[in-house]
Structures are given as structure tokens and as C-alpha cells.
């Protein structure tokens, strides 16, 4: 699958790591490292979407395309919608969202997501991988997704879905054999035309209570195609400790 566009949202504000996109990793800002990884995929174009002039300047200094967006977007998807409009992408263009704090993102995952979206009858696509640890199933910081038999998302939740009623009544320390438990990987692919529609969709109560923006898509009746990845993506950078770990890998 070729010809898709990768958009990397990069905001300067971060509660745990201020100025995160510009954090130095072996002589380059983190957002540039992310863009370099994305460029190893089969994307035709890699664009950073930022709300800060310093990030825009850093991208320009390293030859990375970037666009300046508004600061007041409620979600990353809303920011993508603005970018798709600014780039005048046609409605059938494929847009893959890669987070700006994942300098180790595997290009193969980006390609897999673009391939899924290209062949899907849904306007949104994402990835998941199998969970094998009951502690993760019950962890609200681990987002789970339940799928139908066609590989489309039925629901995303921080709760343990699907819940094995009888098995868990006896023992919650292990996942029952055969229970289809999948962890959502927070990467998305969109058709550009849907992004324009998404910007006008009101948040629903499911999204607000679960704090999961993808539930807005399901709430309004749109489908989300899901492909299973063999492994989780490399860990992103959320804390100073994460940053030091990544710096050691680039040293």
C-alpha cells in the first residue's frame, strides 16, 4: 500500500514532560525522530501538525514538513481534520495518525494500518494485539477492544471486556482459555472525507465517561476496522525516565 499521508500531531504542552516534542534525542528533536521513523514506511508524505512556532521551526531546520494548527482542539483527531483541510486532501485520501512521542514506532505497523484502511468498508481503522495477562485485562489504563466476527470494533473500554462471568467468579488471576481479549493500539487511519465529518460530530456520553475519543465514531454509527498486530508498538515517551531510556537506545 503506497500513497498515504502520515500526520504526526505534536503539542508543546505536556503535564509530565513539558516541551516533549523538542526533547533532544541524539542531536535531533523527538518529533523529528518520529518523522524519520514514519518516513521509513511506504507513506508518500509525512507531515507534523503542531500548535507551536518553535516546533514548526525545528521541523523546518531538519527538512520535515510541518503545518501550524489551532491550539484549542479538543482531541488529536480534531487537529488531523484541520490538517487534512489545510493540505486540501481529497475525500478518498488515506491519513495515518502517528503520535509525536513515539520515536521508536515500527514502520511495519504504519504500513499495516494503511493496508487495512485501504481495503476496509469503514472510514476509520486501527490496530490491536492479544492480551495474555489478567492484570492488564483489569487495568483501566489498558484500553481493550471487543471485535465482531468481521474484525470491526464493537466497543472500546477501560473496563475488562469481554468479561468472563463464570470464570472470573472463581478466579481473576488468569485469563480463561480462549477468551478473546485485545489491547487497543492507539494508532488510527482515516479517510480524509471522514475527518471533515468528524470535526462536526458532538462528543457522546460514552466518550466523555471513558475518556476515549474513538467512542465518538461508534456513537455516531460509523464503523472502525481493526487488524491484529503480532506485537505491541515500541513504548512511547511519557516521562523523563522514558526519555532517558530512548536516549540510551540512540546513543
UniProtKB/Swiss-Prot annotation:
Gene3D superfamilies: Spore Coat Polysaccharide Biosynthesis Protein SpsA, Chain A. It holds the Pfam family CTP_transf_3. It catalyses: 3-deoxy-alpha-D-manno-oct-2-ulosonate + CTP = CMP-3-deoxy-beta-D-manno-octulosonate + diphosphate. GO terms for molecular function: 3-deoxy-manno-octulosonate cytidylyltransferase activity. GO terms for cellular component: cytosol. Its EC number is 2.7.7.38. GO terms for biological process: CMP-keto-3-deoxy-D-manno-octulosonic acid biosynthetic process; lipopolysaccharide biosynthetic process. Pathway: Nucleotide-sugar biosynthesis; CMP-3-deoxy-D-manno-octulosonate biosynthesis; CMP-3-deoxy-D-manno-octulosonate from 3-deoxy-D-manno-octulosonate and CTP: step 1/1; Bacterial outer membrane biogenesis; lipopolysaccharide biosynthesis. It is found in: Cytoplasm. Keywords: Cytoplasm, Lipopolysaccharide biosynthesis, Nucleotidyltransferase, Transferase. InterPro entries: Cytidylyl_trans, KdsB, Nucleotide-diphossugar_trans. SUPFAM superfamilies: Nucleotide-diphospho-sugar transferases (SSF53448). HAMAP family: KdsB. Activates KDO (a required 8-carbon sugar) for incorporation into bacterial lipopolysaccharide in Gram-negative bacteria. NCBIfam families: kdsB, PRK05450.1-3, PRK05450.1-5, PRK13368.1. This is 3-deoxy-manno-octulosonate cytidylyltransferase. It comes from Chromobacterium violaceum (strain ATCC 12472 / DSM 30191 / JCM 1249 / CCUG 213 / NBRC 12614 / NCIMB 9131 / NCTC 9757 / MK).
